[in-house]
Every structure is written in structure tokens, then in C-alpha cells.
């Protein structure tokens, strides 16, 4: 009987904690040095105010452990960027970047920033992969 309250309390605690899951999905081919860009599918969402898809990217080395960073959104143990993508117009707004020496800081007025054309093979690959799966993303 003493276990029932303990189990109930533990269950509430587990459900109250936020899930910190990471599903890094590669969107570029590895370079000759084994570097590859990926995006965190668990961090991606549709911004309710702008309609843009917000996505966190990171560069990692294929075969390294840990392969990708950051360990959580905003943690400064990886190198990457956060973008707001417009899938129809094929453009993006850089929202912020991070590195071990610079924690992630999202620009406060990013929605008012002028978008940049998604150019280059890496941008095209990111747009293709993220936009193809955008219907399943949550809106926040």
C-alpha cells in the first residue's frame, strides 16, 4: 500500500517533465572530411504568427559520438543555426546561431527581418526535406 502513493507521485513527475528528444535528420551528403548538416525534427514547428517553419540545424561528423549537437535546444555544445523557412516562397530568415563559445540567442524581431533567398545546394536540400514533412509539424 505504501508503494501506490510513491508510484503515483513518480508518474506525475515523469509526465510533468518536458521531453528532450532529438531526431537529427541529415539533409546533405557527407563532405570528404565526413561533415554533414542535419536538422532536429523534434525541434521543428510551424510558427503560428508567421506561418513559417522553424528549424534547428547542426553540423556533425559522421561516425563521431556524439555525432550532433546541441544536447538540447539552445545548449552550446554544437554548431548550427535556427531558420524560419517559407516553403512557398523558397526563402528563409536566419533567427540565430550557436557554437560552444556562443549560446543560442533567437533574435527578438526575426519576424520583421527581410527574408533571404534559399540558394545553394545545402539550402535547397534543407527546404526540400523540411517542407516535404511540414504538414505533420505542430503549430506553436
Protein language model features and the residues they cover:
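N-terminal signal peptide c-region/cleavage motif recognized by signal peptidases
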Residues: 16-18
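N-terminal secretory-pathway/extracellular module detecting exported/lumenal segments
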Residues: 20-81, 86-140
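Bacterial N-terminal signal peptides that target proteins for export
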Residues: 1-8
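Repetitive helical segments and hydrophobic/amphipathic motifs
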Residues: 11-12
